[in-house]
């Protein structure tokens, strides 16, 4: 079973002078469109030959799969046009919606002379989504029901195998799993956001407390020139997930999200702000601390969605691929930051809005407190990165790029949101579809990002040259269009070469004014960067992907870059330590050398 998202990590009590470490990993089972979460206790391993150096002890399969969350206390809530409802069953039928739903709400319609049972939505579909009974046997009974020789219901429903835990979670593909403040959260392509809470005793004792369905999210295929799914919503897509022959080929909730634990008015809150990914054109805001209240619908603060009718929230959103952010603004409020995303694969289309939307998490009306439109932006705004310049806990600046190849700085230093501004710090020609990383040097910031896209089939198959950039920013300077000679555009060019599966960088130094605006690394044909880099001290770890086998496979490399000049790592650079016995890694860093005596700065992985 493949793991398609990185594990969650958290620390427990201190024992023998060291904090206990734990993780939660996801295994996904494509044949049943389901996932399982496994909880691990991570142990340190000492290296007697290298005092003070620790690594993680190996985990056996039984160690990895020894503990799972429990699912017996699940509550499910759904947002529809007339509000948020808890899906409660009386007998085996949903109750308490007070006439606010019908078959049409969930895309159950008549076809020709066939008229499905008018109560299918509450007798079959919603009970299927909440997994209320001990098994799915009742749906086998529903599948056999007939009325005058015709099926009673619009489709046959999928029966999930409880012994294989297929009923607990849908397939988790692009969404992360994150642990903060005693909560564990993820989202899945069953159309739900899943919230777990820690219990007493074992630090791995988590139980599913709430599943949230942002049912009003609008959908339409991004990579499709037809009107497929036009005017459809996530609520109407639930029946597709439940259909008997379904195998996971649709998106539910698969965007990134962020958790933030804060104290307001003497009370703890754990805010969650998440994007829909390709599951819809919008985002959702939750307060996880409300899961144990008498009213679980209070967990949902607000949803924001693309609004063609210029309604209350008045925003234009594409598919919100990537990760939104949460930060404290200069007016003292905790706010959620959402990029406008991508409405269509055609970059120059006016359907793509390029803007940054900001929402007050302490006021749940879902109306943005700021809409920062990007003049001349194209292709939609990608995920932002927030910066606290003086480390006082307040956000001063945000950076984000667009698919036309520009990188922008958003000035958020005013207490008044209507005074927030945006300007480009870099103009290129290649699409930027991931958030930048920031490295702080003595007198300036380095904004580090890569170019490339895998949003559409054409993107995946493209072999267009892409780049990694490090742009110097001191809050005032701006660069023009880059000249790839390494001098004309003020960027120092480092060269990337490959020997077998190992990548090598040059370490050219700045001279004659070259590199006064930053640095650039040109990638090989087909390579691209679609993931935010990770910065540790002065090292940027950049994930490079290249698709193969007609887009069905990929080679993935992790490249370590010196953030000061874009060159190879120095002896003092941060780098991963991987055990010699790890044969899954082609080459790794530090002490290893090639046959020609070259020091390997960091290795590559292929999956």
What residues fall within each predicted segment?
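A fold-level detector for beta-propeller and closely related beta-sheet-rich head/sensor domains
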Residues: 1-607
């Amino acid at each position: 079973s493949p793991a398609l998202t990185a594990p969650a990590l958290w620390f427990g009590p201190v024992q023998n002078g060291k904090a206990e470490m734990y993780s939660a990993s996801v295994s996904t089972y494509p044949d049943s469109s389901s996932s399982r979460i496994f909880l691990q206790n991570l142990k340190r391993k000492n290296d007697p030959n290298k005092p003070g150096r620790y690594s993680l002890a190996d985990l056996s399969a039984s160690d990895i799969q020894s503990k799972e969350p429990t699912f017996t206390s699940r509550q499910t809530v759904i947002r529809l046009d007339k509000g948020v409802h808890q899906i409660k069953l009386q007998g085996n039928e949903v109750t308490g919606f007070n006439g606010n739903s019908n078959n049409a709400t969930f895309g159950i319609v008549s076809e020709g002379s066939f008229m499905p049972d008018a109560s299918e939505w509450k007798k079959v579909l919603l009970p299927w989504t909440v997994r209320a009974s001990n098994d799915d046997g009742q749906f086998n009974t529903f599948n056999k029901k007939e009325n005058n020789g015709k099926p009673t219901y619009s489709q046959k429903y999928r029966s999930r195998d409880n012994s294989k835990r297929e009923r607990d979670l849908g397939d988790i593909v692009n969404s992360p799993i994150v642990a903060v403040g005693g909560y564990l959260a993820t989202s899945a392509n069953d159309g739900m956001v899943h919230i777990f809470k820690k219990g007493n005793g074992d630090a791995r004792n988590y139980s599913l407390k709430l599943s949230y369905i942002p049912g009003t999210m609008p959908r339409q295929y991004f990579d499709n020139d037809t009107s497929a799914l036009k005017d459809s919503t996530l609520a109407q897509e639930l029946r597709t997930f439940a259909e008997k022959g379904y195998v996971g080929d649709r998106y539910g909730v698969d965007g990134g999200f962020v958790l933030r634990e804060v104290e307001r008015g003497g009370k703890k809150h754990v805010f969650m702000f998440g994007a829909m990914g390709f599951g819809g054109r919008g985002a959702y805001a939750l307060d996880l601390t409300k899961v144990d209240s008498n009213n679980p619908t209070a967990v949902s603060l607000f949803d924001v969605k693309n609004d063609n009718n210029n309604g209350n929230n008045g925003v234009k959103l594409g598919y919100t691929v990537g990760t939104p952010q949460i930060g404290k603004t200069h007016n003292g409020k905790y706010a959620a930051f959402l990029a406008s995303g991508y409405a269509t694969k055609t970059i120059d289309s006016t359907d793509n809005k390029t803007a940054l939307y900001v929402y007050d998490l302490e006021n749940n009306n879902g109306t943005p407190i700021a809409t920062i439109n990007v003049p001349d932006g194209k292709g939609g705004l990608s995920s932002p990165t927030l910066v606290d310049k003086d480390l006082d806990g307040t956000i001063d600046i945000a950076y984000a790029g667009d698919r036309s190849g520009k990188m922008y700085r958003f000035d958020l230093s005013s207490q008044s949101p209507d005074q927030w501004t945006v300007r480009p710090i870099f103009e290129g020609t290649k699409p930027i579809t991931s958030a930048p990383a920031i490295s702080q040097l003595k007198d300036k910031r380095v904004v580090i990002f890569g170019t490339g896209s895998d949003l559409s089939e054409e993107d995946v198959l493209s072999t267009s040259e892409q780049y990694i950039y490090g742009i110097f920013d001191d809050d005032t300077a701006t660069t023009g269009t880059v000249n790839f000679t390494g001098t004309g555009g003020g960027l120092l060019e480092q060269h990337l070469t490959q020997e077998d599966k190992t990548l090598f960088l040059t370490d050219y130094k700045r001279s004659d004014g070259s590199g006064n605006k930053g640095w650039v690394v040109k990638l090989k044909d087909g390579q691209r960067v679609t993931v935010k880099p990770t910065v540790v001290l002065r090292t940027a770890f950049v994930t490079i992907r290249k698709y193969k086998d007609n887009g069905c496979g990929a080679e993935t490399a992790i490249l370590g870059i010196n953030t000061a000049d874009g060159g190879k790592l120095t002896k003092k650079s941060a780098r991963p330590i991987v055990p010699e016995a790890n044969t899954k890694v082609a080459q790794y860093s530090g002490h290893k050398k090639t046959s020609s005596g070259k020091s390997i700065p960091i290795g590559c992985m292929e999956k």
